[in-house]
Amino acid sequence: MRVSGAGVTQLAPQDAEFVYSESSRHRSNIVVVYLFDTSAEAAPLTEPEAIAWMRARLGHAGMFTRRLRRVPLDLDLPYWAPDPRMNLRDHVHVSPAEAPGWDPLRRQISRIADAPIDLTRPPWELHFITGVTTRERGLRRDPISAGDPDRMTAAVLKFHHSAGDGIATRDLGRRLFGPDTSHPPVPTRPRDWSTATAVTRALASLPVQCLRFRRGLAAAGAADERIRAEVADGTIVEPALSRPSCRFNRPISAELTFDLVILPGDQIRAAQAAADGATVNDVMLATISGALRTYLSEQDESPDGSLAAMVPMSLRGTGKGVADGPEGPRATHLALMAVDLHTDIGDPVDRLRAIGASTRLEKQRSRNEHVRRSARRIESSPALLLRLAGRAKAFKDHSGPTVERYNTMISNVPWAGDDLLLRSAPLVRTFGILEILDGSGLRHLIVSSRGDGVAVSFSTDAAMMPDTDRYRDLLRDSLRDLAEPAHEVGI
């Protein structure tokens, strides 16, 4: 992200890609939900109180007070610029829970998560849902969450992916809800955004952009040659370019839904012991693999070959993102791995071992200097090319028998911490919701849970998976199948 004036910064190509890909069938929303125990509060949070609470915290992220500004004809990458008309009433909302129980809460949060973000304003929203209870069903059935409070408030933070990735979300949540009562000041509004200045600068930089693009293509081409050589000699292993398609790889309908399961830590550790050397992430991938395999089998839709997952790997540390401050050069720091889920292997422990081996190979490939250099070709791509690539996604055919590289997404975000508070209300649980899109109608997010367990949320198309309860049960059963061999031998 290049600085072009006080308070005005230009998006990095990796972040601008989310702007250019935005459509009704390809949203780039990031959503995280925090549940707080408000059973000791005398009265629920009101909207004026919520607005005052948020006003004190606006200095924690540039996106809270800045909006996207696109250059006419996309002659250059978009900019973040201060929004002089920013009104907190457009961003902070308070509403009561529509009904007791987990299912009504899911529906209420799903509507919030799937609604488009207004990119003519700072691209974020914060919704508070008061009077939440999970008493009737759902989470109460999980032993680890059997002690949920009788009254909670859900804080639903939503923002555009161009402003940050999953790790940035975790860090921002810690700043907003952390115990520190001191908050940075809101930046003073600098000079106004000038479209004419941006166009003039873009036209003047066109020769430099063309030269940078040529050099980027040459560097990426050289890196691709080295990759082919290292694949040939076995130094790295390329993942399969195509996978058999399944119901979750079709165009999505209009209804997003999600669900959540809490998986017990003792079973995760037992599964690790059953396959010596397996990591927690390996166990989670194998758990999802087993559930997906069984779910498709029950629909009489077992694929001809193994399915694979897109697994983002964080590259944090290469630069600061928007959530860290307005001067950061990049908001998104991710490499996208394609991990074989080995859904064609019947034995659960054998499948876990195979997934562990595939994950290690993909991590090795993704960290390879030539692979990373090849991926950096986007850094020199002109804005117009990124825009055309983004628009092309809307016309992609998803009716074929195969898909490119992966069938589902499995992401992992570390636990935000035990000391988060909403006013004086302590945190009970946090989970995220990943946006679905055409060709990717089932996505999973793993969050280390408070206490001894791991929370797995999954978002899907209600038409593709009308029975999320069944998939939740299959996730539990899949982990139990992985843990049983260790219990049988007394590990």
Regions found by a protein language model. Give the residues of each.
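TRNA-binding/sensing appendages of the translation machinery
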Residues: 26-30, 48
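Basic/hydrophobic alpha-helical interface regions
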Residues: 18-19
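Soluble acyl-CoA-dependent acyltransferase catalytic core bearing the H(X)4D motif
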Residues: 2-14, 33-44, 51-441, 447-454, ...
